[in-house]
Amino acid sequence: MNPAHLLILAAVCVSSLGASSNRPMPLNLYQFKNMIQCTVPSRSWWDFADYGCYCGRGGSGTPVDDLDRCCQVHDNCYNEAEKISGCWPYFKTYSYECSQGTLTCKGGNNACAAAVCDCDRLAAICFAGAPYNNNNYNIDLKARCQ
């Protein structure tokens, strides 16, 4: 097995351990979680981990609402970042700042880190401006996301 693939497999396995919201996760996802908590402090980041057709695992079909559309755009943004040589968005850390609900990506990030930071920053801002519909949490993906 390719060492890079083995590293990814190990990271995914480690990130899936645990049974609570304190489970380990790749560092970038930890940073994204913190960005979400910066812009939407009234909700748990976990509320966004299994929402609609695009927030969380997978992503297909038509977004169910504006919040789900934020996740679709975020997925597409990560796909674009992956085109940067050696850029793995789910594992790339970056420098940013949260101050009173405002997110800023720091200037010292390399091209990949800057792209991923901006993807996460824009998604967190989008989440803050989109209504949350409890009926779109943990939906039946096969029935609603074709």
From Swiss-Prot:
Binds 1 Ca(2+) ion. It catalyses: a 1,2-diacyl-sn-glycero-3-phosphocholine + H2O = a 1-acyl-sn-glycero-3-phosphocholine + a fatty acid + H(+). GO terms for cellular component: extracellular region. SUPFAM superfamilies: Phospholipase A2, PLA2 (SSF48619). Residues 22-27 form a propeptide. The keyword Metal-binding applies. The active site is at residues 74, 120. Ca(2+) binds at residues 54, 56, 58, 75. One of its GO terms (biological process) is lipid catabolic process. Its main location: secreted. Its EC number is 3.1.1.4. InterPro entries: PLipase_A2, PLipase_A2_Asp_AS, PLipase_A2_dom, PLipase_A2_dom_sf, PLipase_A2_His_AS. Disulfide bonds join 38-98, 53-145, 55-71, 70-126, 77-119, 87-112, 105-117. Its cofactor is Ca(2+). Residues 1-21 form the signal peptide. GO terms for molecular function: calcium ion binding; calcium-dependent phospholipase A2 activity; phospholipid binding. The keyword Transferase does not apply. It holds the Pfam family Phospholip_A2_1. Expressed by the venom gland. It comes from the Eukaryota. Keywords: Calcium, Disulfide bond, Hydrolase, Lipid degradation, Lipid metabolism, Metal-binding, Secreted, Signal. It is found in: Secreted. Belongs to the phospholipase A2 family. Group I subfamily. D49 sub-subfamily. PLA2 catalyzes the calcium-dependent hydrolysis of the 2-acyl groups in 3-sn-phosphoglycerides. This is Acidic phospholipase A2 2.
